[in-house]
Amino acid sequence: MWEREKRFMISGDHILARITPNICLWDYDNDYLAIYLRNLRKVKTMQLGTLLTAHRQVITEVDARIDELIAHHARRLDEICGILEGGDATVWQLAHAMHWDFGTGEFAKFPPSQRWFALLEVFAHAAIFLQVVCLISTRHHWVVQ
């Protein structure tokens, strides 16, 4: 819900204050991460003063938070590209090699539900590389081109 005159929005899970929304790959026909990033940029043009999230936080520095989310995803993409420079890897292997700000930070120690979210996020980040021709998808691996 957006109140243009009051510069107010209820964002649901689209923009969260303390964590990043879990952007997943649900099919290969859509680039969900690119869509999400495009939508963040669109929200930034709305010049919001207050944003209510689905996790009970109020965000008053909306543009700054959007910039943080965009930067987070850029770092993730750089991290995956750096890992893949060492050779091909499955999404599972990528997830194990990545830095995580959850629990101990070790993917292997995540509870099953958190591993599931992490893997779907890695899939979404790896899939965006298909758009920039950094990776190709083989049957079992993402490979740097």
Q: Over which residues does each language-model region extend?
A:
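Metallo-beta-lactamase
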Residues: 1-77
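C-terminal regulatory/interaction regions
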Residues: 82-145
